[in-house]
Curated annotation (Swiss-Prot):
This is Putative cyclic nucleotide-gated ion channel 9. The keyword Mitochondrion does not apply. Its main location: membrane. The lineage of its organism: Eukaryota, Viridiplantae, Streptophyta, Embryophyta, Tracheophyta. It is found in: Cell membrane. Residues 649-678 form the IQ domain.
Length: 733
């Protein structure tokens, strides 16, 4: 009768258990099926067994019935798909985006924004609810307690708007996936997208709390007072609002904490900045002051009403309790009560008498004597009560002088305990958030103190101490205590490459050696560069020391000096600026495929004339780049390297000087030979003798001078030509 095909299920053994997985129809076409096929495989078979002699009339009469039944079966099939039948119950977060189900990822940006707005709405709801406690007030001219209609309408409207957003959040919870607890073995886990399971989980956890929080009971009470009782049921309205607001506060506060925890779990942090976190806890403290002030106002009015009720019940006059509430002017005996109420209530319940008053109002006397319970100015009433709550929460109620009334004493005890807990919570969390702003500075101070103690213990000379202090100060100003290299190394490779490219590419292109290289080679170089800082008068490298890194100057000026290994009489000095580099001996070593592990020696001494920022490429990294990228072996790089290398520039200058001196010597010898040839043609003996003596003197002087120049030329030629890098590969680009 029921002909349903089996669903395609994939089984796999995981942790010794046979797990079943069902794919979404929209994810893989191999498991998808058309609507007609689905209807044929999962519909009621009304044809029955086929008989050869079936009558045609029976087929015609049952055709309409079968057609209607198929339509109904098709409708049931669509309903089954809409409620989640035949859809996988757990998927990964990235698969949820392509799913046909309208289910939200708990870490979706839209949902995170809604959660933050919902936390804000909860705080606003907790702030709006105390406004209902300000509705009752005392009418001095009529000596009765009434309800502020204007404030009631405003509070009801605000509460309704906030509850509407609360209802939207509740509806959103039925469409929010959750991570299956069994899938949290590794990674983020799988998301459960089955609407039935999502609804079941929400109903078992926070639905009851949310439902009790969103019940519009205060709105109903106020609406009943304004439009049904016509303002005649002040006592019932006051009692109902007091009970409802205080009772609904419990689920609202209970819901606020897990919602904040859930926001931290999904977003990673609750507040993006330290100031936002500190402001959040300060706001909660002010909110507590607002609640305490509203409760104090209501209890003060209740205490005042208690005094009136006591006078009314003890009076020999005809006094009914309802006479104390406005709206009961039509009751029997009210006219007689109006003639004596002022004198009776003022005599037995004075609020301005300090010497032996007939009724002790205790901590509520200030509210009654200030006149806020009878004021219709909500702004002055609200801020006065807010200040009272903030003052007594901060002082833990130390200035309160209570009466013997038990309710008043209990309220004072609760106020002191709440003030102690909230003040500790505020100070602790604000200290935590604000310390995070200066934690780097404190770490720097501790390191500087340890450095000073160490230098004092090791008895370092003053000049070394000053250099250490200058370096620490310069490094702090440049990095603010952040270990940039370690921070970048902890990121994924592609993200690390993009960050290095953003930070270093423009600076590396300013180095002429790398100006015309391709992008892949520049990416490889940028990924391996490390920032370096040097203070004034510090040595980057000394002549004769092994060169373990090649430095590319980004900012600052350096002095590069060479003495050709300490040879007397030889000194060469040049300046390095932004875009230059030093340690070029390492490039020759890296390009040589036969170079061993011994690092080359530096031919120059580099000293910082100002604060210097540079990028360093260590020997192993340069060797790797040179071996992987043949672009470094091009002729263009060869010419650029020779042009900007200080070692090659020095050799070229010395070579040119030696060649020029050889040329000058040759010209002088040629001139001397011509003079000798001209002198041989003279026949006068006196003139010949004179010329012979002059020639002998000049010859001696020339020989002596030539010897000195030849020796100087030999000394210049002694400066060896720098090693030629292996530029065997031609530039093919």
């Amino acid at each position: 009768m029921l002909d349903c095909g089996k669903k395609a299920v994939k089984s796999q053994v995981i942790s010794g258990r046979l797990e079943k997985f069902v794919r979404l129809d929209s994810m893989d076409s191999r498991y998808s099926q058309t609507s007609d096929t689905g209807l044929n495989r999962c519909t009621l078979n009304l044809q029955g067994p086929t008989r050869g002699g079936g009558a045609q009339g029976n087929n015609v009469s049952s055709g309409s019935f079968k057609k209607g039944f198929r339509k109904g079966s098709k409708g049931l099939w669509s309903i089954g798909r809409s409620i989640g039948l035949g859809v996988s119950r757990a998927v990964f977060p990235e698969d949820l985006k392509v799913s046909e189900k309208k289910i939200f990822d708990p870490q979706d940006k839209f949902l995170l924004l809604c959660n933050k707005l919902f936390v804000t709405s909860c705080i606003l709801a907790v702030s709006v609810d105390p406004l209902f406690l300000y509705l009752p007030f005392v009418k001095d001219n009529e000596k009765c307690i009434g309800i502020d209609r204007k404030l009631a309408i405003i509070a009801t409207t605000l509460r309704t708007v906030i509850d509407a957003f609360y209802l939207f959040h509740m509806a959103l919870r039925f469409r929010t996936a959750f991570v299956a607890p069994s899938s949290r073995v590794f990674g983020r886990g799988e998301l459960v997208i089955d609407p039935a399971q999502i609804a079941k989980r929400y109903l078992q956890q926070y639905f009851i709390i949310d439902f009790l929080s969103v019940l519009p009971l205060p709105q109903i009470v106020v609406w009943r007072f304004l439009y049904i009782s016509k303002g005649a049921s002040v006592l019932a309205t006051k009692r109902a609002l007091r009970s409802i607001i205080l009772v609904q506060y419990i689920p609202r506060f209970i819901r606020l904490y897990p919602l904040s925890s859930e926001l931290k779990r999904t977003a990673g942090v609750f507040a993006e900045t330290a100031w936002a976190g500190a402001a959040y806890y300060l706001l909660l403290y002010m909110l507590a002051s607002h609640i305490v002030g509203a409760i104090w106002y209501l209890l003060a009015l209740e205490r005042y009403n208690g005094c009136w009720t006591k006078v009314c019940s003890n009076s020999s006059l005809d006094c009914h309790r309802n006479f104390l509430f406005c709206g009961n002017e039509k009751m029997d005996g009210y006219a007689a009560w109006t003639t004596i109420k002022d004198s009776v209530l003022q005599l037995n319940c004075p609020v301005n008498t300090t010497d032996n008053p007939p009724f002790d109002f205790g901590i509520y006397l200030r509210a009654l004597s200030s006149g806020i319970v009878s004021s219709k100015s909500f702004v002055s009433k609200y801020f006065f009560c807010l200040w009272w709550g903030l003052q007594n929460l901060s002082t833990l109620g130390q200035g309160l002088e209570t009466s013997t009334y038990p309710g008043e004493v209990i309220f004072s005890i609760a106020l002191a305990i709440a003030g102690l807990l909230l003040f500790a919570l505020l100070i602790g969390n604000m200290q935590t958030y604000l310390q995070s702003l200066t934690i780097r500075l404190e770490e720097m101070r501790v390191k500087r103190r340890d450095s000073e103690q160490w230098m004092h213990h090791r008895m370092l000379p003053p000049e070394l101490r000053e250099r250490v202090r200058r370096y620490d100060q310069y490094k702090w100003l440049e990095t603010r205590g952040v270990d940039e290299e370690n921070l970048v190394q902890n990121l994924p490779k592609d993200l690390r490459r993009d960050i290095k490219r953003h930070l270093c590419l423009a600076l590396v292109r300013r180095v002429p050696l790398f100006e015309n290289m391709d992008e892949r080679l520049l990416d490889a170089i940028c990924e391996r560069l490390k920032p370096c800082l040097y203070t004034e008068s510090s040595y980057l490298v000394r002549e004769g020391d092994p060169v373990n890194e090649m430095l590319f100057i980004i900012r600052g000026r350096l002095e590069s000096v060479t003495t050709d290994g300490g040879r007397s009489g030889f000194f060469n000095r040049s300046l390095l600026k932004e875009g230059d580099f030093c340690g070029e001996e390492l490039l020759t070593w890296a390009l040589d495929p036969k170079s061993g592990s011994n690092l080359p020696s530096s031919t120059r001494t580099a000293k910082a004339l100002t604060e210097v920022e540079a990028f360093a490429l260590i020997a192993d990294e340069l060797k790797f780049v040179a071996s992987q990228f043949r672009r470094l072996h091009s002729r263009q790089v060869q010419h650029t390297f020779r042009f900007y290398s200080q070692q090659w520039r020095t050799w070229a200058a010395i070579f040119i000087q030696a060649a020029w001196r050889r040329y000058v010597k040759k010209k002088k010898l040629e001139q001397l030979r011509k003079e000798e040839e001209e002198g041989e043609g003279s026949v006068t003996s006196i003139r010949a003798t004179f010329l012979a003596s002059k020639f002998a003197a000049n010859a001696l002087r020339k020989v002596h001078k030539n010897r000195i120049e030849a020796k100087s030329t030999i000394e210049l030629v002694k400066y060896q030509k720098p090693s030629e890098p292996d530029f065997s590969a031609d530039d093919t680009s």
